[in-house]
């Protein structure tokens, strides 16, 4: 049986559960796919050229995580779907000898929310994940605000129609989303007292990090604010990516079931 290689680019990457859940799917669906896929973590030096690495490794597809999603958008031969709007790519697939970029973070995040009636969201951070979330939440009719410590990247959100801030707005929000990398450094993304104010009035504190109780989620728990980590988003975006890797042979709900069973 033919072997195909896949992977996930990131820095850091050792924490990633993507290899675990994707390899479970490649093993489960190898008969339907007609090939055996192997998916591995790829630690990419910060100055690396993603496309060169992708081609050098002979990959058929890959995911892209922190801090490369915006850079991945720049190197694709073609961009499809909501990735065109959000300027960030987390899924790379070879289609007809072209490197095609998708974004499955956006829909993956929305599916992970479970269709609750949220009306407003505050996104902390302005990177590739924040862009994808802002695009999807706007599309779903929510009022989206973005808070970032610097002006870097905020022009994108302004063009999108989000309210943008460098100082914490004195407002209330249904969703407070940590899309920064602060949790990976075991830090809060924002002043503790300011966060407390948002959590007390909010309906859900959501951290894109997963696998441990982050300082952000710990504070929400302390205040008895409903909270959620990024595990379900990870699995949904991975299942949506797997659908792309399988050339739509394996619909994402089937992939999701397998991935959920191992993580």
UniProtKB/Swiss-Prot annotation:
User: What Enzyme Commission number(s) apply to this enzyme?
Assistant: 1.1.1.25
Q: Does the keyword Oxidoreductase apply?
A: yes
- CDD domains membership: NAD_bind_Shikimate_DH
* Residues the record lists as binding shikimate: 16-18, 65, 90, 105, 210
Q: List the disulfide bonds.
A: none
Q: Where is the signal peptide?
A: none
What reactions does this protein catalyze? shikimate + NADP(+) = 3-dehydroshikimate + NADPH + H(+)
Q: Where is the active site?
A: 69 (proton acceptor)
EC class name: oxidoreductase
Task: Relate the protein's function as given in its record.
Answer: Involved in the biosynthesis of the chorismate, which leads to the biosynthesis of aromatic amino acids. Catalyzes the reversible NADPH linked reduction of 3-dehydroshikimate (DHSA) to yield shikimate (SA). It can also use NAD to oxidize shikimate.
**Assembly, per entry:** Homodimer.
**Protein name, entry field:** Shikimate dehydrogenase (NADP(+))
Q: Which organism is it from?
A: Helicobacter pylori
């Amino acid at each position: 049986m033919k072997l195909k290689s896949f992977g996930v680019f990131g820095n850091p990457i050792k924490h990633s559960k993507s290899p675990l859940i994707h390899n479970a799917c490649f093993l489960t669906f190898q008969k339907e796919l007609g090939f055996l896929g192997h998916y591995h973590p790829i630690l990419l030096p910060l100055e690396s050229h993603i496309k060169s690495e992708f081609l050098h490794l002979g990959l058929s597809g890959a995911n892209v995580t922190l801090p490369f999603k915006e850079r991945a958008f720049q190197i694709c031969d073609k961009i499809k779907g909501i990735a065109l709007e959000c300027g960030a790519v987390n899924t790379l697939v070879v289609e007809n000898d072209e490197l095609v970029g998708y974004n499955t973070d956006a829909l993956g995040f929305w599916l992970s929310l479970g269709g609750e009636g949220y009306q407003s969201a505050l996104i902390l951070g302005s990177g590739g994940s924040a862009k994808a979330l802002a695009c999807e939440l706007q599309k779903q009719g929510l009022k989206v605000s973005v808070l970032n410590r610097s002006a870097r990247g905020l022009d994108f959100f302004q063009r999108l129609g989000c309210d943008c801030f460098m100082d914490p707005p004195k407002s209330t929000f249904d969703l407070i989303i940590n899309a920064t990398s602060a949790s990976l450094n075991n830090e809060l993304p924002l002043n503790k007292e300011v966060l407390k104010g948002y959590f007390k009035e909010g309906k859900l504190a959501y951290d894109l990090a997963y696998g441990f109780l982050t300082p952000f989620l710990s504070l929400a728990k302390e205040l008895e604010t409903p909270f959620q980590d990024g595990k379900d988003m990870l699995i949904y975006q991975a299942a949506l990516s797997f659908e792309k890797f399988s050339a739509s042979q394996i619909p994402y709900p089937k992939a999701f079931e397998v991935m959920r069973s191992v993580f």
